Amino acid sequence: MLTIFIVTATLFAILYLYFTRNFNYWKDRNVVGPEPTVFFGNIMESVIRRKHLIMIYKDIYEAFPKEKVVGIYRMTTPCLLLRDLDVIKHVMIKDFDLFNDRGVEFSEEGLGLNIFHADGDRWRVLRQCFTPLFTSGKLKNMLNLMSDRGDKFIKMVEKICDKEPEQQIIPLVRKFTMASITTCAFGMELDEEMIETLDKLDSLIFTTSYGNEIDMMYPGILKKLNSSLFSKMIAPFFDNLTKTIIEQRGGKPTNRKDLMDLILELRQKKAIEPMKKTHDEQVTTLELTDSVIAAQTFIFYAAGYETSASTMSFLLFELAENPDIQEKVIAEVDETLKRHNGEITYDTLSEMTYLTQVFHETLRKYPVADILLRNAKADYAVPGTNVTLKKGQTVVVSGFGIHYDPKYYPDPEKFDPERFSPENVRNRHPCAYIPFGAGQRKCLGMRFGQWQVQVCIIKLLSKFRFEPSTKTMSEF
């Protein structure tokens, strides 16, 4: 019995020492931060799914208002949370070549080689390849597709509201974003079977796994094990869908000008070379195979579907809670559409300046893509501090923390679109608003996402007004 006790106690002692081995890292370097918990570091509530990680980082951000940087532990791995906007600007923009990797490595198989998750030269090739696809000129062609889906969406909403005017918003607007994304990406008309398939797929895409936590504890292990962050059921769907569409189009672009068309135009160039070689990376080319194309269409769908729907839902919630703002938006929508004969064009959207301010204030208050991660590619002396990051270490930026910092946004809980008037934007630090990221890894599809939200809101406000119901949640 005594032997069992000694063995058990020894085992626990060894495990304790192992899982706390790094927990003096920041203290030894005189970097302040919250006390870590054994095994979990500073993210225990996220690991046990009690609290979202974005809220944990926001709480840490707010707990150290005088610090430029804060030492934290993602599981057992030391990382640095950046608070100072000038430091963030250095990392994200000025010294970008040293921080162009997100640092979450996993298998390139099964959709892993997408532009969001790719790092190093792979990312550079993809970025150079796909940036021209998301210019205003290219995306203008998709506005007609969005607007057409918006008209069909409104007819559906009218039928639903005729039966019951009190509706939960998020399921409704998801129907629009699903239809908009699939037509703009794949040229697809949704039938009931496809809607059911996509609904099941969405539950897999947006269900959190423990892959991130495993990577935090053992950086790079997912790639070594050829494992992915995504369910194995997701890749076959996008692979098959991509191959089917390419075959239907004879492997060549049509005149539809959707995302698949633009990608097929790129594929006619056969291979794309990176712009330049940096550090010890190897210059490579990347062939746009069906699987590479599938990975890009997957991330386009995943990034544009739920984020846009959530933003629309939050925006309409705020309009319902602030009827004076809603009336101002409706007046602008009505007047602008009248000038443009009811058509939603690039010029129509450009002239709806107040709606644009409302959109940005929504993303300030509800930043759906919040946490920014970057890996140091070399030892790095953090500007304005005595801290040196070691090669391979990760920095974390809390967009939520910044967006709710009263230093940049007085009375941050208040919904105030005037924060994004041209004058206020000019007078604010460029890194004080980062819902799409910052620097060269800023979201490529941000303009598409903004237009998609605005088109849907314009269509809805042309027909309806929104009011809180007795079931409306006062807080999200």
From Swiss-Prot:
* Molecular-function annotations in GO: heme binding; iron ion binding; oxidoreductase activity, acting on paired donors, with incorporation or reduction of molecular oxygen, reduced flavin or flavoprotein as one donor, and incorporation of one atom of oxygen
CDD domains to which the protein is assigned, alphabetical: CYP6-like
Localization, UniProt? Endoplasmic reticulum membrane; Microsome membrane
Q: What does this protein do?
A: Enables the insect to feed on furanocoumarin-producing plants and evolved as an adaptation for detoxification of xanthotoxin and other furanocoumarins.
Q: Which family does it belong to?
A: Belongs to the cytochrome P450 family.
Q: Give me the residues that bind heme, please.
A: 443
Give the superkingdom in one word: Eukaryota
Main location (coarse class) = endoplasmic reticulum
Return the protein name: Cytochrome P450 6B5
Any signal peptide, and if so, which residues? Answer: none
Q: Which UniProt keywords apply?
A: Endoplasmic reticulum, Heme, Iron, Membrane, Metal-binding, Microsome, Monooxygenase, Oxidoreductase
Q: What is its EC number?
A: 1.14.14.1
Expression is induced as follows: By furnocoumarin.
Q: Organism, per UniProt?
A: Papilio glaucus (Eastern tiger swallowtail butterfly)
The reply to whether Membrane figures as a keyword in the UniProt entry is: yes
InterPro entries attached to this UniProt entry: Cyt_P450 (IPR001128), Cyt_P450_CS (IPR017972), Cyt_P450_E_grp-I (IPR002401), Cyt_P450_sf (IPR036396), Insect_CytP450_Detox (IPR050476)
Q: Which GO terms describe its cellular component?
A: endoplasmic reticulum membrane
Q: Which Gene3D superfamilies match?
A: Cytochrome P450 (1.10.630.10)
User: Which Pfam families does its entry note?
Assistant: p450
Query: What is this entry's stated membrane topology?
Result: Peripheral membrane protein
